[in-house]
A protein has these predicted regions:
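The DNA-recognition helices of helix-turn-helix-type DNA-binding domains
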Residues: 46
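Glycine-rich flavin
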Residues: 49-68, 215-217
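Glycine-rich loop at the start of a catalytic domain that most often binds anionic cofactors/ligands
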Residues: 43
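Flavin (primarily FAD) cofactor-binding/catalytic cores of flavoenzymes
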Residues: 1-8, 13-32, 36-38, 67-292
């Protein structure tokens, strides 16, 4: 086999698109039951914060939507149709467990089989490796803790005292809807930064692209105020601001069995903590190669 390729979303499909245009023999290994990658696990109300044209992958543009930014279901449908359009050789569900060097090849192991390839593209992303910060007393806390990767909808927190931890877009969006049904507090390491109401995620793509080009060319560029983690003012976040709930407090010091202790020594009873604290690269399968 010329190339083995395992994936969780858009980057993998884009790579497969270009591999398909070569004479290489390749196969795509996907851990999911069906198309959609990490989008299959996003919360119900999740939407892109940029137009469809800015979230497309090579070869076929994502169809536009009439009601603002594409929903989770729209993205999954696009990825499903994209996969079918190009008839990529995909095997699923296959969870790659490790990759090792053998004579003349790289051997890709799953739980029940293996493949030998001259090259391997790891497009596993980060979704399967959520980052949860270490806090003193976390193991003693009797309430619920979950990462945004496992969050589905706000109704599960109705009437509860909830901490939403994390200052990025996921934190702002989850706070916006949980605060409608729960006593929610937003916890961030610093004051969140917000893009202007009339600016969407396109500016983040532009900043990231310019930063990458500068790095490749050895240039130093002046970055605008803010960064790639600035909160995009999508309608639910704007509505939360209008309700007066879009304000954050600094992190607590430690957990107690029934809540948290803040830096000033005060205590708050808490029923649930939603960690919107990002992800780490899901590259543990590369450890046998010594490159991760």
């Amino acid at each position: 086999m010329g190339c083995s390729h395992h994936w969780r979303g858009q980057a993998a499909l884009a790579t497969a698109y270009f591999l398909r245009r070569t004479e290489l023999s390749f196969i795509v290994l996907d851990a999911e039951e069906a198309a959609g990658g990490a989008w299959r696990h996003g919360w119900n109300s999740l939407r892109l914060f940029s137009p469809a044209t800015w979230s497309s992958i090579p070869g076929w543009m994502m169809p536009a939507v009439q009601d603002g930014y594409p929903s989770r279901e729209h993205v999954i449908d696009y990825l499903t149709q994209y996969e079918a359009r190009y008839q990529f050789p995909i095997e699923r569900p296959v969870r790659v467990t490790s990759i090792e060097r053998v004579t003349g090849a790289l051997r890709v192991h799953s739980e029940s089989s293996h493949w030998d390839a001259k090259a391997v593209v790891s497009a596993t992303g980060t979704w399967s490796n959520p980052n949860i910060p270490s806090y003193p007393g976390a193991e003693l806390f009797r309430g619920q803790q979950l990462h945004s990767a496992d969050y589905v909808e706000p109704q599960a927190f109705s009437g509860k005292r909830v901490l939403v931890v994390g200052g990025g877009n996921s934190g702002a969006q989850i706070l916006a809807e949980v605060s409608k049904v729960a006593d929610a507090t937003w916890v961030t390491p610093t004051d969140p930064l917000f893009l202007p109401d009339d600016v969407d995620g396109r500016v983040l793509f532009e900043r990231a692209t310019e930063r990458w080009k500068a790095q490749m060319e050895g240039r130093v560029i002046e970055q605008p105020v803010g960064g790639l983690g600035d909160v995009v003012m999508v309608p639910p976040v704007v509505e939360a601001r209008e309700r007066g709930v879009l304000h954050a407090v600094r992190p607590f010091a430690r957990f107690t069995p029934d809540g948290v202790v803040w830096a000033d020594g005060s205590e708050t009873a808490v029923d649930a903590v939603i960690w919107c604290t990002g992800f780490k690269p899901a590259l543990g399968h590369l450890q046998p190669l010594g490159c991760y």
